[in-house]
Amino acid sequence: MSDTVPLVARIRSDLELLEARISGHAYFKALEEHRVHPDSLKVFVGQQHHLISSDLRSIALILSRQGMLPSRYFWINILQGEAAALDALHALASTLGLELSDLEVFEPLPAAHAYCTFVAWLALYGSDAELAGAFLVNLPTWGACCDRMRKALQQKYDIAPSTLAFFDLFADMPSFENEALSIVQNGLDRGLPERLIHRAARMLQGYELMFWDAMASAADVPRNGES
């Protein structure tokens, strides 16, 4: 993995400002100050229902397309994690008074849905290395967001920890760095240009920011003064 480690380090360095905008997003501060109305939490759950449902199909697609590569075991684990997340999300939805039928008719927000649309694009047109590289950069960021959100929901909204398993799955996700690095290296060895790994990570991280911007907008949280 001699090529991959410095490549990922450069990507992370290049995306530091974007990472800071996500981790310091005003939406999290609003949650921690109980300024997000409980009804707006339903928006988060409704959007995640569409995202996770889409990502399940996308991971199944990349597994179908490139399932003869060594990366198949990685994608099987990711697929199982997404399935568990969808079940946990439905438990959270029930706590907020939402039925599965409510989630299925919840209208996707374009800015919130961009993330899973790009994951689907990578699964259809990209490589396992591009998607693994994008996840390698993005999922730790998403996990940190989930950690901050579960703490706020438990402390400020009195939501029982037992119903916050959706956030636990991502916030406490075991490290998959070595597996993802190996997949990226395998892609480079097959001739994949480094710029495509960088592009996939940059785009997905940008769509992550768009998701939180959409959540802030839906909750009437000003995006300036992020903290």
Where are these regions (language model features)?
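Surface-exposed peri-terminal alpha-helical interaction modules
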Residues: 72, 160, 178-181, 224
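Accessory, usually C-terminal, subdomains that scaffold auxiliary metal cofactors
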Residues: 179-191
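Acidic, carboxylate-rich catalytic segments that either coordinate divalent cations
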Residues: 194-227
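Alpha-helical bundle segments that constitute or directly flank the non-heme di-iron/ferroxidase center
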Residues: 16-23, 31-65, 125, 130-147, ...
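Acidic, low-complexity proline/glycine-rich segments
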Residues: 1-27, 106, 110, 175-179
